[in-house]
């Protein structure tokens, strides 16, 4: 069976991921007029820039959808977002600022839940608005086929007939008007935005040029913290975790995780927390640039990692970071549910996140400027009395430390011999300006 269809399958059911925007509206109407039977599926991901979800399926029916469904994906999206925080599944960082993989998380949820809904309706052909140059075309392909092995893919934007007729936004708008729908194009921004409850992505157009900056972006989840005329008073916030799960903000608990994430977004958003400017490597190895917002994810991540460093030992923290970066890449590539990702997730959630219980109090200021004011946990292995500089009882004595240092002579001697061997073979310079200490040949001295 051909998985990817290059031309419209006339007379067959096609499920389209319908956003209600110009592109998917024109595509749905065009498919109906050309003889296909379109079914519209809209994911409610808690997009901060969407005002009326219920109106979207109604518009789809007006444009010719055989049926239109609104799928509430918020609970699953937040669950995957919390799992990503527990695992540190983030691999893109610049100058200490993190991209929280909010778009890949959204695609993992959308790609599985919409295709599952289509399968319930007997729809085995799926179309969406992703382009052939981006990451989403592969993410949706993978998640769709994982959910429905019989799935076929039809994308109007890969169909030359569709492109020839409606290749641009102006042509799409004219087509909608000619068909009796007063669809006016929205005002063009200097960049493109995609969002869900976890975060927003701003990219393309003017943001493709590196001499543009965050200053051209109008945040949809936060504030323009770089604008000094915007007043942003400092604010204290306390985040509580129980066994790796965020359960309270400023002492307030929530009936569900969706409400908790919304409140985290509101708190972080008041300061512009979690905005970052990243150059990243797409799945096809070409570099792209994006400016990201994720105020709630950033707030939870900061508090989580503060507890992490106070609870776990150095080797565990090292494995958390290494495996988290690896898992972040898998998530980015659309492999969040692959076996290698599930293995990493299970170990990180079982052995790391399960011990993260406690509270962290932060002072948020402008943007990513914050201070940690207090850290409290019954699981802390940070115990100041062990290393206090004040006189008093100690868990080890000066003689104990002398013995420990004496044992270091073994590996110091081995290292000295290795350095001499490198120098003898010419790998190390004998220059006095070398950063490596000058190593004397001790063989002739019987050492």
UniProtKB/Swiss-Prot annotation:
Key word Ligase present: yes
Entry-linked SUPFAM superfamilies: Adenine nucleotide alpha hydrolases-like (SSF52402), Argininosuccinate synthetase, C-terminal domain (SSF69864)
Localization terms from the record: Cytoplasm
Keyword annotations: Amino-acid biosynthesis, Arginine biosynthesis, ATP-binding, Cytoplasm, Ligase, Nucleotide-binding
Recorded metabolic or biological pathway in which this protein acts: Amino-acid biosynthesis; L-arginine biosynthesis; L-arginine from L-ornithine and carbamoyl phosphate: step 2/3
EC number annotated for this UniProt entry: 6.3.4.5
Domain of life: Bacteria
GO MF term set: argininosuccinate synthase activity; ATP binding; protein homodimerization activity
Coiled-coil ranges from the UniProt annotation: none
Record's keyword annotation contains Protein transport: no
Protein's UniProt name: Argininosuccinate synthase
């Amino acid at each position: 069976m051909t998985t990817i269809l290059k031309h419209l399958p006339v007379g067959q059911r096609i499920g389209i991921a319908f956003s209600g925007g110009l592109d998917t509206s024109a595509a749905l109407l065009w498919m109906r007029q050309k003889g296909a039977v379109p079914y519209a599926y809209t994911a409610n991901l808690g997009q901060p820039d969407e005002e009326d979800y219920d109106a979207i399926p109604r518009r789809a029916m007006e444009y010719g959808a055989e049926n239109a469904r609104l799928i509430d994906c918020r609970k699953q999206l937040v669950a995957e977002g919390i799992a990503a925080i527990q695992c540190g599944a983030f691999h893109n960082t610049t100058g200490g600022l993190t991209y929280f993989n909010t778009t890949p998380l959204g695609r993992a949820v959308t790609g599985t839940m919409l295709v599952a809904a289509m399968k319930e309706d007997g729809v085995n052909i799926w179309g969406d608005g992703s382009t052939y140059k981006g990451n989403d075309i592969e993410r949706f392909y993978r998640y769709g086929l994982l959910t429905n092995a019989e799935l076929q893919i039809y994308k109007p934007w890969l169909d030359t007939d569709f492109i020839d007729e409606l290749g641009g936004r102006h042509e799409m708008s004219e087509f909608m008007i000619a068909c009796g729908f007063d669809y006016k194009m929205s005002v063009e921004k200097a960049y493109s935005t995609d969002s869900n409850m976890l975060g927003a992505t701003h990219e393309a157009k003017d943001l493709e040029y590196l001499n543009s900056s965050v200053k051209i972006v109008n945040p949809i989840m936060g504030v323009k913290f770089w604008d000094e005329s915007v007043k942003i008073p400092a604010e204290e916030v306390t985040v509580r975790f129980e066994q790796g799960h965020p359960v309270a903000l400023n002492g307030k608990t929530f009936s569900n995780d969706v409400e908790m994430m919304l409140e985290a977004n509101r708190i972080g958003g008041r300061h512009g927390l979690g905005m970052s400017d990243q150059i990243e490597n797409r799945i096809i190895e070409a570099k792209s640039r994006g400016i990201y917002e994720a105020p709630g994810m950033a707030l939870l991540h900061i508090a989580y990692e503060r507890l992490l460093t106070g609870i776990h030992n150095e080797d565990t923290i090292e494995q958390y970071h290494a495996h988290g970066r690896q898992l972040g890449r898998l998530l980015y590539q659309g492999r969040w549910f692959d076996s290698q990702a599930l293995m990493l997730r299970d170990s990180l959630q079982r052995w790391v996140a399960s011990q993260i219980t406690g509270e962290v109090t932060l002072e948020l200021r402008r943007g990513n400027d914050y201070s940690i004011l207090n850290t409290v946990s019954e699981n802390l292995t940070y115990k100041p009395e062990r290393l206090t500089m004040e006189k008093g009882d100690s868990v080890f004595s000066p003689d104990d430390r002398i013995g420990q240092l004496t044992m270091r002579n073994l590996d110091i001697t081995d290292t000295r011999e290795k350095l001499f061997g490198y120098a003898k073979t010419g790998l190390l310079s004998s220059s006095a300006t070398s950063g490596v200490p000058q190593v004397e040949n001790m063989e002739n001295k019987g050492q």
